[in-house]
């Protein structure tokens, strides 16, 4: 069984969700480096439509629920974001805000994410990951019942700060 109770097969690829504005960014480069040689699908939030959270729960058709379904099937999901003003990018923050829907109107889909493995991959200009982002991501995982397996950080497109965190994520993605 996969985390969260769903059937996991050898063909279930990991999932990386890219939340950077330009498609060819430092963060996109880091995603390619982290996932090199592993089965991993990519969702570029900048290339799809996801409406901002609405308390009324009324949305024009968008891709949010499709992405959540992919996350529920993946052995691990990597949230990849540049660090802007000590936090996620705007597109990543908007995506995470929509998880409130899973606690209001899409409860069964939200349940499928419990005990799933999530990791954060961040790129920024500082020597280390911003502590506020670390806390925000860990609390996000806790709030939906997911397991935060690692926080991976690199300065722009430089070396990863913590090779141990990289190894944890790659193992979860199927590296032997």
For the regions a language model picked out, list residue spans one by one.
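N-terminal beta1-alpha1-beta2 submodule of the flavodoxin-like/Rossmannoid cofactor-binding fold
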Residues: 1-109, 148-149, 153, 159-176
């Amino acid at each position: 069984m996969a985390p969260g109770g769903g059937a996991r097969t050898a063909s279930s690829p990991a999932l990386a969700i890219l939340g950077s504005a330009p498609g060819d960014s430092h963060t996109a480069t880091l995603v390619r480096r982290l996932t090199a040689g592993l089965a991993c699908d990519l969702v570029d939030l900048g290339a799809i439509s996801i409406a901002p959270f609405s308390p009324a729960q009324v949305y024009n058709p968008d891709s949010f629920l499709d992405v959540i379904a992919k996350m529920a099937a993946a052995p691990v999901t990597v949230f990849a974001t540049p660090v802007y003003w000590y936090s996620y990018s705007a597109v990543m923050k908007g995506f995470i805000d929509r998880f409130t829907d899973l606690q209001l109107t899409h409860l069964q889909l939200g349940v499928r994410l419990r005990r799933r493995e999530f990791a954060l991959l961040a790129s920024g200009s500082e020597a280390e990951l911003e502590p506020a982002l670390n806390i925000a991501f860990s609390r996000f995982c806790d709030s939906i019942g997911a397991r935060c397996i690692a926080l991976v950080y690199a300065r722009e497109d430089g070396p990863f700060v913590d090779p141990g965190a990289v190894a944890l994520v790659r193992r979860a993605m199927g590296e032997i």
